[in-house]
Amino acid sequence: MSAQQTNLGIVVGVDGSPCSHTAVEWAARDAQMRNVALRVVQVVPPVITAPEGWAFEYSRFQEAQKREIVEHSYLVAQAHQIVEQAHKVALEASSSGRAAQITGEVLHGQIVPTLTNISRQVAMVVLGYRGQGAVAGALLGSVSSSLVRHAHGPVAVIPEEPRPARPPHAPVVVGIDGSPTSGLAAEIAFDEASRRGVDLVALHAWSDMGPLDFPRLNWAPIEWRNLEDEQEKMLARRLSGWQDRYPDVVVHKVVVCDRPAPRLLELAQTAQLVVVGSHGRGGFPGMHLGSVSRAVVNSGQAPVIVARIPQDPAVPA
């Protein structure tokens, strides 16, 4: 990764949920591998308890204000407890010399806008797959879902520990399609694989149709082979610079005529990490989240880093 980005820290958002606990452990290990600071935060939103209707007595307004103050004070006290506990979890997941680089903080404001603004200033934001109060088996939590659509940099979404657990040598998987965000995904994936000392599986699924839907029967064998060769060369070109930069990473190239999402989901079942671009070859600048990245994140099968490129040119990537 770029020297400027590598020196930036990692922020993990917490809320006291089991997924949040797992996200803190993951973030602590990743920050240690990068040798950067880890900031544990919880955002406390404002409490609004205005009386119903347009007309109300001043005494009712005062009562509502008092309830708001009491409820907000309770939420702040609870947030400090959650951050303190998460800070301990981060310390336990890190080596003894990391204590000075791990901090905890309670912030105030709307949750998603606050974390989105923070994402401008850090290497990555880490969140749990589901937040407090989420039902088991539910889809992606509202905060995680919103942040992967609006953040100004990479966002890691961490599910509870997958079953069966992934072995330490499980590979990192990255989806490559030639788009700018998949280029950033390749950079992140090579860096993560190198730091973890594991292989990298680079998938290029180059059809928007399944293999049975593709009109292969209308192609002459030589034409089909030429098309496959072209796709394999494209993947090799996309990876060559990163392979030169990370010669220690063993790369397994997978090129298939298929839709990307099902193949990435298949590979995610045995991966310790999946890296995808926020939107692929069918996307456009400013697009929030593509169908492939959304499917992979929503599956909750493995930790996923969504590579997002800042829209503001003044913000470092």
Swiss-Prot record:
Binding-site list for ATP 1: 13, 128-134, 142-143
Sequence positions that bind ATP 2: 175, 208, 277-283, 291-293
Keywords, sorted A to Z: ATP-binding, Nucleotide-binding
GO molecular function: ATP binding
Highest taxon of source: Bacteria
InterPro entries: Rossmann-like_a/b/a_fold, Universal_stress_UspA, UspA
Induction per the UniProt record: A member of the dormancy regulon. Induced in response to reduced oxygen tension (hypoxia) and low levels of nitric oxide (NO).
Gene3D superfamilies: HUPs
Keyword Nucleotide-binding assigned: yes
Family stated for the protein in its record: Belongs to the universal stress protein A family.
Name the UniProt record assigns to this protein: Universal stress protein MT2052
Species, as recorded: Mycobacterium tuberculosis (strain CDC 1551 / Oshkosh)
